[in-house]
Amino acid sequence: MQIILLEKIGGLGNLGDIVTVKNGYARNFLIPAGKAKRATEANMKEFEARRAELEAKQAEILADARARQEKLDGQTVTVAQKAGVDGRLFGSVTNADIAAAIVAAGIEAVKANVRLPNGPLKAVGEYEVEVALHTDAVAKITVAVVAATE
């Protein structure tokens, strides 16, 4: 199915691009989420009429993400978790735990934005973690996993 992108989507294209995607991806995700419209003549004309408005909105969203990236870059977030004497955790530190620690530090974050390429953290130590605030704004933070003291 051919669609018009209403915002930048990583791995797919930029605002205003006409791309071909699988029908289910368009019908079940992109169109209901307001990220795309079918590429019909009427929708293309409507998009061209609203292009400046949509570009301004996307620029505002990117500026907000870049501002949050500036606050977040280089920050160290500490997460306390029960651990054994050998430094292995009784459980793991997930992206939800890291997002909660970032929010506790006073910066807005969602667990879906926290990228853990090697899966959940399972040992005490310091880890480099990426927080994808936007496709063009990715902050790198340090997560310090410490043994919880009771």
UniProtKB/Swiss-Prot annotation:
Q: Name one GO molecular function term.
A: rRNA binding
What GO terms describe the biological role, i.e. biological process, of this protein?
A: translation
Taken from the UniProt record, the cysteine pairs bridged by disulfide bonds within this chain are none
One Gene Ontology CC term in the entry: ribonucleoprotein complex
**SUPFAM superfamilies in the cross-refs:** L9 N-domain-like, Ribosomal protein L9 C-domain
PROSITE patterns assigned:
RIBOSOMAL_L9
Q: Which UniProt keywords apply?
A: Ribonucleoprotein, Ribosomal protein, RNA-binding, rRNA-binding
Its function, per the record, reads:
Binds to the 23S rRNA.
Q: What HAMAP family does the database record attribute to this sequence?
A: Ribosomal_bL9
Q: Which family does it belong to?
A: Belongs to the bacterial ribosomal protein bL9 family.
This protein is called what?
A: Large ribosomal subunit protein bL9
What species was this sequence derived from?
Neisseria meningitidis serogroup C (strain 053442)
Classification from the root reads: Bacteria, Pseudomonadati, Pseudomonadota, Betaproteobacteria, Neisseriales
- In the UniProt record, the gene name given for this protein reads rplI
